[in-house]
């Protein structure tokens, strides 16, 4: 299971870390020894998934980089050349003061004919500033993702009764340091980003534990922490 493997690869420092598997979709949650099943949990769209060593991944599926990927593809179709992700990030940074925001969980963003037009329409419908440039569209998406991560963590704290002190991001999306920094700022929690190949590493870890190369999951995670560059973004 890709998410299950990715969560295993999180080099968390303690049991107060939120896990975020960041890719086309964002899977945000924690590991628990027991499932959490009150009606409020279902209403907030959190789920319990069985995991390694009879743990439960308690998580929520949130929009991830799909909106950014869609904008990139659309711009490529318009110009004949797809902009790079660093170019899109730079455009957003130039529009960093733009305050557009949408609800990334809205079904309108799942498969629109034009993601750019849909973002603009959603801002207009919500009475928010309407982006006019690529940078403003990108900044709107970044504002929205970081806000929705922050809202999900607040829900998570309410449902678990725990206060979390950091966020560990794994997967391809962990390379987007601008989103990582905005997430740190929105949540007021430090963000630790990496490793990128969480799913492959988690799968390998389980096999190596079984083969006796690692004593247990804690030992394997300690090795991940020492073996890969983990970048930190402190809240501002």
Task: Go through each PLM region and give its residues.
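Active-site core segments that coordinate phosphate-bearing ligands/cofactors
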Residues: 1-166, 175-199, 205-235
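Glycine-rich Rossmann-fold phosphate-binding loop(s) that bind the pyrophosphate
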Residues: 172
């Amino acid at each position: 299971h890709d998410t299950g493997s990715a969560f295993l690869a999180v080099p968390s420092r303690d049991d107060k870390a939120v896990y975020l598997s960041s890719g086309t979709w964002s899977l945000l949650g924690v590991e628990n020894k027991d499932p959490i099943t009150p009606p409020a949990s279902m209403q907030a769209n959190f789920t319990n998934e069985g995991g390694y060593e009879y743990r439960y991944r308690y998580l929520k599926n949130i929009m991830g980089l799909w909106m950014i990927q869609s904008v990139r593809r659309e711009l490529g179709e318009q110009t004949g050349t797809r902009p790079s992700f660093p170019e899109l990030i730079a455009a957003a940074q130039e529009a960093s003061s733009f305050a557009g925001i949408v609800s990334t969980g809205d079904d309108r963003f799942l498969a629109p004919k034009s993601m750019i037009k849909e973002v603009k329409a959603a801002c207009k419908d919500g009475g928010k500033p309407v982006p006019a440039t690529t940078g403003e569209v990108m900044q709107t998406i970044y504002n929205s993702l970081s806000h929705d991560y922050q809202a999900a963590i607040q829900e998570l704290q309410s449902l678990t009764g725990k206060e979390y002190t950091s966020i560990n991001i794994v997967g391809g999306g962990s390379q987007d340091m601008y989103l990582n920094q905005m997430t740190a700022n929105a949540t007021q929690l430090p963000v630790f980003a990496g490793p990128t190949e969480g799913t492959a590493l988690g799968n390998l870890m389980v096999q190596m534990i079984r083969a006796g190369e690692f004593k247990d999951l804690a030992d394997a995670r300690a090795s991940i922490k020492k073996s890969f560059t983990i970048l930190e973004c402190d809240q501002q």
